[in-house]
């Protein structure tokens, strides 16, 4: 892939990190050398990945080459969406207000809360016995 006429965006969500390259094409989405439908079995994950492209109506005008690592399926889909959004803003800055209004520009900063000593999980307490 040549560096000319392509745009790049990095996306992160939970512990996942995605690198997204977009260039003019006919709508092919390649994730880790696999197609979108092969990589994500769940339709909800595929929908999350397509959201920014459908919003700006560029789904069938751009090819996407994506590498993603870390985390689970949901986190990876969110990281890819964030990366696509950043790459689209680099591609055309006039798309920023629409993407911002949809909430795609802001990085979701929620992380897994750590487990505390004396608790079963982050907030799950042992059962309380009155007597």
UniProtKB/Swiss-Prot annotation:
**Stated family:** Belongs to the universal ribosomal protein uS9 family.
**Which protein are we looking at?**
Small ribosomal subunit protein uS9
From the Swiss-Prot or TrEMBL record, what is one GO molecular function term?
RNA binding
Asked if the Swiss-Prot or TrEMBL record annotates the protein with the keyword Ribosomal protein, the reply is yes
Q: Which GO terms describe its biological process?
A: translation
Q: Which UniProt keywords apply?
A: Ribonucleoprotein, Ribosomal protein
NCBIfam families referenced in this protein's UniProt entry, alphabetically: PRK00132.1
Gene name as annotated: rpsI
Q: Which organism is it from?
A: Actinobacillus pleuropneumoniae serotype 3 (strain JL03)
């Amino acid at each position: 892939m040549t560096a000319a006429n392509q745009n790049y965006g990095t996306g992160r969500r939970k512990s996942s990190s995605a690198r997204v390259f977009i260039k003019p094409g006919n709508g092919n989405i390649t994730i880790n050398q696999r197609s979108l439908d092969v990589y994500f079995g769940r339709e909800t994950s595929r929908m999350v990945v397509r959201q920014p492209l459908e919003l700006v109506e560029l789904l069938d005008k751009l090819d996407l080459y994506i590498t993603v690592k870390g985390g689970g399926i949901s986190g990876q889909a969110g990281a890819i969406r964030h990366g696509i959004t950043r790459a689209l803003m680099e591609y055309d800055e006039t798309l920023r207000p629409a993407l911002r209004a949809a909430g795609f520009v802001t990085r979701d900063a929620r992380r897994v809360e750590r487990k505390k000593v004396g608790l079963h999980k982050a907030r799950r307490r042992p059962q309380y016995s009155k007597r």
